[in-house]
Design a protein with these regions (language model features):
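Bacterial Sec-exported substrate-binding components of ABC uptake systems
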Residues: 2, 6, 11-92, 201-234, ...
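Short helix-initiation/N-cap motifs at beta->coil->alpha
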Residues: 58, 68-70, 127-143, 182, ...
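Short helices/loops that flank or line small-molecule/ion binding pockets
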Residues: 77, 140-151, 171, 273-283
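A short, structured surface patch at a secondary-structure boundary
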Residues: 81-149, 153-159, 260-263
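Short, structured coil segments at secondary-structure junctions
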Residues: 98, 171-172, 258, 312-313
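Extracytoplasmic ligand-binding site segments that recognize negatively charged/polar headgroups
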Residues: 110-115, 161-165, 177-193, 228-253
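Structured C-terminal subdomain patch of bacterial secreted/periplasmic proteins
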Residues: 185-199, 205-209, 219, 288-346
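Alpha-helical, coiled-coil/dimerization segments enriched in small aliphatic residues
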Residues: 243-271
Length: 346
């Protein structure tokens, strides 16, 4: 299995919303613009190196585990009540058969759509999520919402600020395990961590075997067909151009894993906006546009010079659920990657 040509170093967008950019905290991790409809990672952390021995062998009671940010967290073993504050975490939690443990999930403020701004309609239905489970994570974090859910453990990504994490742990006394993979292999690591927390290592190993097999299949496909068609992958558009993924993002890494080359893959801006003239000059063989949350082909057709892009003219514009491009979770590998392999290497 080959490593992706670009190992993501910046967190993929993590929170779907259409909010003014003035609310966003770290500009390098957001889509710069007045308002966009994608997921956004709000916060970055200086991850401390784990010191000494942290991880213990759990069997009951509390145990220590090192999370993705290098934090040594003392967590309850197999907690019955868990708050999951990220769609990318809810995905493996569900796949591992842990839905019954989930008592709360992340939501945006009611005025901006609540649950439906963080989760797609398919996710809400599949995972049986309800508005009553909402913990508001934006534009401000509601400690009260979380307290009312009475979880024993919080699993969160970097849509949660360090201040909020500190408040959860010090004010409420609830441990927080941060799951924010930095690479594709980190997705498998998080599956293993979740398996350890809930005492279901066998199920985690089985899921990781599926993920490994899919990555191996992608590697074999690239060997059998070494062509690397150029691609514009976009998740939103406005009058100025097409929002896309630069270097160090999961969106770019997924394109590379599928045996193609993003026309913006070397851009130092993780989430640049490409003007129409740049897209036309690059002449990508394919266009992959993110769908869901109100985005569809008709929406992108309103973009500058959309109908003049040769890939669009030749019928090589393909819609793909935005979750597959932005959420670092098993579904990105199990569903998104095979779809792209079929598109680029039929």
């Amino acid at each position: 299995m080959n490593s992706p040509a670009v190992a993501p170093t910046a967190a993929p967008p993590q929170h779907r919303t259409r909010v003014p950019v003035s609310w966003l905290v770290v500009i390098v991790l957001v889509v710069a613009g007045s308002a966009v409809g994608v997921t956004v990672a709000y916060y970055t952390y200086n991850s401390p190196a784990a010191s000494g021995t942290c991880t213990s062998n759990p069997s009951s009671g509390n145990f220590s585990i090192t999370d993705d940010l290098g934090r040594c967290v003392t967590a309850p073993y197999n907690p019955a009540r868990v708050a999951v504050l990220s769609p990318s975490i809810m995905d493996p939690v569900y796949r591992l058969g842990l839905r019954s443990h989930v008592v709360a999930v992340d939501c945006y403020a009611d005025a901006f759509g609540g649950l439906t701004e963080d989760y797609s309609s398919d996710q809400i239905q599949l995972w049986n999520l309800t508005q009553s489970m909402c913990v508001q994570v934006g534009p401000t974090f509601s400690l009260e919402d979380l307290a009312n859910a009475t979880p024993q453990l919080v699993l969160a990504s970097t849509i949660i600020s360090l201040t909020a994490v500190d408040d959860i742990e010090t004010t409420l006394g609830i441990p927080v395990v941060m799951l924010q993979p930095a690479t594709v292999s980190g997705i498998l690591t998080d599956v293993t961590l979740i398996g350890e927390i809930f005492g279901i290592s066998s199920a985690a190993s089985a899921l990781n075997a599926q993920l490994t097999a899919e990555l191996a299949n992608a590697s074999a496909t690239r060997v059998n067909d070494p062509t690397t068609p150029s691609v514009l992958v976009t998740y939103d558009v406005d009058s100025n151009g097409y929002w896309t993924f630069g270097a160090g993002t999961f969106g770019t890494s997924l394109i590379n894993l599928s045996g193609a080359a993003s026309i913006s893959g070397s851009d130092s801006n993780p989430y640049p906006e490409l003007p129409a003239e740049t897209v036309l000059a690059a002449n990508p063989a394919f266009v992959v546009y993110g769908t869901g949350f109100g985005l569809n082909e008709s929406y992108y057709a309103g973009g500058p010079d959309w109908s003049s892009i040769p890939a669009v003219e030749s019928g090589h514009a393909v819609g793909l659920d935005s979750n597959y491009l932005t959420e670092p979770d098993p579904t990105m590998i199990l569903v998104g990657l095979p779809v792209l392999l079929t598109v680029f290497h039929p």
